[in-house]
Amino acid sequence: MTQQITLIKDKILSDNYFTLHNITYDLTRKDGEVIRHKREVYDRGNGATILLYNAKKKSVVLIRQFRVATWVNGNESGQLIETCAGLLDNDEPEVCIRKEAIEETGYEVGEVRKLFELYMSPGGVTELIHFFIAEYSDNQRANAGGGVEDEDIEVLELPFSQALEMIKTGEIRDGKTVLLLNYLQMSHLMD
């Protein structure tokens, strides 16, 4: 069912790094009643993420980096273990994720497989993330990784079983990473 939505006002509150909108809109309900809503929406662009796995070694490549939003929300160190990811900017998702993989992990991946696209926080964030997996091997290591410019990224090659256990212990708390690790487990690619 399509609901009627009428934009009343879109005020930009900030466009420092990303864009924060204050949006006023009317939503016509199924019964015909029109309800006015006022919401803040954070537009950070769309992104892509990839989980690198090695079925023979039963390992995955993740990264650890400082994430200020987690630090503000009580993650004492601000460090987060996650899959390689980045904003699309003007790139296609596959182009973006290949670039991010080599910058962040040092691996120049071959065939990548797109799994799905998901909104991770649709109540207030516009971002749509494209999810990928790719098998990696040691001979695809082009550099040490670690990111670019102001990034300080640690590359982690972990046994797959340990990564799954780290979800249970709370060491891995990033949503996209949990989704991709669980997908890998359910797909039986590591069996």
Swiss-Prot record:
Major enzyme class: hydrolase
Residues reported to bind Mg(2+) 1: A85, E104
EC number: 3.6.1.-
Reaction equations catalysed: GDP-alpha-D-mannose + H2O = alpha-D-mannose 1-phosphate + GMP + 2 H(+)
Superkingdom classification of source: Bacteria
Subunit relationships: Homodimer.
Homology family: Belongs to the Nudix hydrolase family. NudK subfamily.
Protein name: GDP-mannose pyrophosphatase
Organism encoding this protein: Shigella flexneri
Gene name of the record: nudK
